[in-house]
Design a protein with these regions (language model features):
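Glycine-rich hexapeptide-repeat left-handed beta-helix
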Residues: 3-45, 79, 83-87, 93-100, ...
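N-terminal segments that cap or nucleate solenoid repeat domains
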Residues: 26-70
C-alpha cells in the first residue's frame, strides 16, 4: 500500500460511522481553495481490523473503520475533503474515492463498491451496492440498501432500497427486503475474504 503522509499519526478515531460527523471539524475539513502542500494533510486513520491491499493508494484524510477493506489498485485520495469508509465496507479493485471542496466522501456500514467504480463527493448509506464501473457524482446520496447497476452514472439522489441504472441513472424498481439483505451479506463475505488476505500476509511476512 502506498501512503502519502507528512504529519505524525493523529489519535485513532472511534471507528464507528455514527460518530464520524463529529470528527470532521477536527480534521482538515473540506478545502475551499486549491489543494495545499502535503504537509497540511492529516495522516490516514486505519483501524487495526481493516485491511488495505499492498497496491492500494491511501492519501491524506482517509479513515477506515474495523472490517473495512481497500482492494488492489483502489485509490482513496483525501487531499481535498475527508473520506470515511464505514465498518465492514469494501472498496474493490481499481475503484476511486475522491471529494471536492465541501463535498466529502462518506460511506456507511456494509457497503460494497464494485471494481473500477468511482465515488466522487458522495454519500453511500448502509448496505447499498455500487456496481462494477458505476460512477456516483458530487452531492449525491445513495440511500440505504439501494443498488446502482454496473456502468451507471448517478447524478441525483437514489431512494433507499431502489434499483437504479443507466446514464443518467433512473429508478427502475424497489428491491425486496431479501435482495437488500443479500447485499449486506455480500459485504460480509468480502469482510471474511479480507481477513483471509490479512492472515496470508502475516504468515508470509
Amino acid at each position: 500500500m502506498e501512503r502519502i503522509t507528512q504529519r505524525p499519526h493523529p489519535p485513532r478515531g472511534p471507528g464507528q460511522p455514527g460518530e464520524w460527523p463529529n470528527l470532521v471539524p477536527q480534521s482538515m475539513g473540506c478545502l475551499t481553495g486549491s489543494t495545499p502542500w502535503p504537509e497540511a494533510w492529516p495522516e490516514p486513520r486505519i483501524d487495526p481490523l481493516a485491511w488495505v491491499a499492498d497496491s492500494a493508494v491511501v492519501i491524506g484524510d482517509v479513515r477506515l473503520a474495523a472490517g473495512a477493506s481497500l482492494w488492489p489498485t483502489a485509490v482513496a485520495r483525501g487531499d481535498v475533503c475527508p473520506i470515511l469508509v464505514g465498518e465492514g465496507s469494501n472498496v474493490q479493485d481499481g475503484a476511486v474515492l475522491h471529494g471536492d471542496p465541501d463535498q466529502p466522501v462518506t460511506i456507511g456500514v456494509d457497503v460494497t463498491i464494485g471494481h473500477r467504480a468511482v465515488v466522487h463527493g458522495a454519500t453511500l448509506e448502509d448496505g447499498c451496492l455500487i456496481g462494477i464501473g458505476a460512477i456516483v457524482l458530487n452531492g449525491v446520496t445513495v440511500g440505504a440498501g439501494a443498488l446502482v447497476a454496473a456502468g451507471s452514472v448517478v447524478t441525483r439522489n437514489v431512494p433507499a432500497g431502489a434499483l437504479v441504472m443507466g446514464a443518467p441513472a433512473q429508478v427502475k424498481r424497489q428491491l425486496s427486503a431479501e435482495a437488500q439483505a443479500g447485499q449486506r451479506q455480500h459485504a460480509r463475505h468480502y469482510r471474511q475474504l479480507a481477513m483471509a488476505h490479512a492472515q496470508a500476509r502475516r504468515e508470509n511476512g
